């Protein structure tokens, strides 16, 4: 089996699974309980929080545990919008965000907020000058993803941070679900970033658990009320086993991070060089420093993306059509549409996404399998004629 769909989800790391099993069987007390079982659970909860904070280079009290990237994004966006609505109801995002951001902005728009969606260029990147022009006295929030989940574009977070340095009251949220452990941290995080979202299952941790980074002093309204866990921002008994396993997975991921990212890039480079220049092939994830090393999106004209996915699946090779979170919906190639890619090409797009366990030998096997498909469809569609 060749699994090139790691941006959709990753296999849980054995050591993270071991941690999960140990915690769920041995440290099963409620962290809010006053007795020693609760104390022990609370101690592990806070140790995990500190471990995550240290790995990200932030303060321990700025880390909040959620159910995943979607909840983190919703909490950051809705929490800011509602908490600051008396100061202004203008919020800004891009036209290429993950559905958990894009749909949240649409919901707020329907509730009376004024939304600006920044356009992107032919590489799916926003222009910081467009953001600068959009800011006004009513702006309370800017939310721009760090790495695009469909084609791997790294957004200009540094340049945006420099602009927002002159607007200290505006909250700046970055969806960094696709960015952790890819050797690009200095491109997607600055001291001006107020909030970030992360999802455990994207970096070999368990599903159903995630992280919200919120800078000290930034006010958010919680999405739900209850027992006041997570400093009142996220009520509900903490999923301690998943939290501890996620912290372990993050530590493993960030060990030898550059070496792992280089291995992923080598696979992307090998396949990209094979694809380059072939008639009917369109590559949307070039070999450039402002693209993530682990994502390769391309299209083969004349064959729908899902057809290619299932054809390769028959050979035990697993890829996806752009975002797995929207791949069964009609708007699956939203980033390519925002880039003004012709529909016939956008619907042919597929995404390969790698992790540190993938190998160059797997890349060779993929190339061999894909080449047979390419030769077959080239004849049918008269590519290159």
Swiss-Prot record:
[2Fe-2S] cluster binds at residue 325. GO terms for molecular function: catalytic activity; iron-sulfur cluster binding; metal ion binding. Disulfide bonds: none annotated. It comes from the Bacteria. The active site is at residue 325. Pyridoxal 5'-phosphate binds at residues 69-70, 149, 178, 199-201, 237. Keywords: Iron, Iron-sulfur, Metal-binding, Pyridoxal phosphate. The modification N6-(pyridoxal phosphate)lysine is found at residue 202. The keyword Iron-sulfur applies. Its cofactor is pyridoxal 5'-phosphate. PANTHER family: CYSTEINE DESULFURASE ISCS 2-RELATED (PTHR11601:SF50), CYSTEINE DESULFURYLASE FAMILY MEMBER (PTHR11601). Belongs to the class-V pyridoxal-phosphate-dependent aminotransferase family. NifS/IscS subfamily. This is NifS/IcsS protein homolog. The lineage of its organism: Bacteria, Bacillati, Bacillota, Bacilli, Lactobacillales.
